[in-house]
Amino acid sequence: MNKKVSAVLIAVALTAAGHVSAAELNAYSIMPEKYASRIFAEFTKDTGIKVNFLRFSSGEALARLTAERGNPQVDVMLGGPAATYAAGMKDGICEAYRPKDSDAIPSNLRDPGNYWTGIGVIPLCFLTNTKFLAKNNMKAPSKWADLLDPRYKNNLQMADARTSGTATERIYSLVKVMGEDEAFKFQKKLNGNIQMYTKSGAGGAMPIATGQCASGIFYIVDALDIAQQGYPVTITYPEDGVSFGIEATGVIKGGKNNAEAKQFVDWAASKKFAEFIVANKINYVPTRTDVKTSNPILDLSKIHTVQVDTAWKGEKRKEYTQRWINEVIK
C-alpha cells in the first residue's frame, strides 16, 4: 500500500477510535515502531485497552501536535527526548500529570511541573563498522575530533537536526563539551565527512551495519540494537564527554481518552514497565532506582556524561536547529 495512503487511513482510524470505544487509546510514538508495538501490546495485555498509534520522529511529532492542538488527534505520546516535550510545553501541548508510584524516578528525570515523565535514559555513542576499521587500519573513535579523520570522508551518517531529536542532542553535547561557537565550527568541519543526514535518529544505523558507510552518532538504544543482531559493529563513547537523552512519556492536553492516557502514563512509570524493557532488551537505562540493567555498556558510571538541563534544551532547540542549518549545511 502506498505509504502516504496508509498513513492517511491510519490517521482516520485514530480519529474514529476515540468515538468508538472508551477502552481505546490513540498515541504518537517517537520511540521506534519495533519497540513501541511491543510496549503497547504489553499494555493492552495488562489493561485490556487497545492502542492505535503512529510513529514519527521527534520533530515531526512536535510539529503535528502543535498543528493539532485545537483538535488533538491523540491522547498520549510515547518516547522521544524530554526536550521535545519541553519545547512543546509552552505551546500548551501537554497536560500536567504526575503518574502513580513515580517516587522511584529521580526528580531530575521528571519534569518539575509534571508535563513529562522519564522512562529511560539514553546516552549518545559512536557506532562504527569493524570491517571498515580493519580495512583502513583504524581504531574506533574515542573522541569527537576522531570523526574529522579524512578516511571518514563521505562515510558518516547521522541524523538531521530539522527532524530528529537525536541530532539536536548531538548539538547539545557538542555545545557543552566545546562551547557554543566552537561546537558549530566543529560541525561545519564534520559536514565535509557526511555521506547523508537521515530523517530519524536511527536511520543511519543499518547502513553502518551493512557497510554502506562507516560510522555515526546515535542514541545507545539504536546502536545496541544493531550490535545485538550480530552485525560487525563496535560501540564507543566520546571520552571528552557526551550528553544523554531522557526518553519520556506524557499526556496530550485535550485528548479524547484522557483517563486511558493517564492509565498508560501510570503503567509506563511503573516498576513492571521498567522490568519489561530490561527483560525484552529494549535498551534504555531504566529511570527507576529499583530496577537495574546488567548490560555493562549501559553503565552510566563508566561514561563521561555531561548533564544538560532539559528546560535549556527545550529553549535552545529552535535556535540551535536554525543555526545548524545556516552555519553547517548551507
What are the residue ranges of the model-derived segments?
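Sec/Tat signal peptide C-region and signal peptidase I cleavage site
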Residues: 16-22
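Early extracytoplasmic/lumenal segment of secretory-pathway proteins
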Residues: 22-87
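Extracytoplasmic ligand-binding site segments that recognize negatively charged/polar headgroups
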Residues: 30-31, 36, 73-212
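A ligand-binding cleft/hinge motif common to bilobed small-molecule-binding domains
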Residues: 83-87, 209, 214-232, 281
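A bilobed periplasmic-binding-protein/Venus flytrap-type ligand-binding module shared by bacterial periplasmic
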Residues: 127-132, 246-257, 276
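Periplasmic-binding protein-like
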Residues: 186-191, 197-198, 229-253, 289
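Mature extracytoplasmic/periplasmic domains
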Residues: 252-308
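Extracellular/periplasmic bilobal clamshell ligand-binding domains
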Residues: 294-330
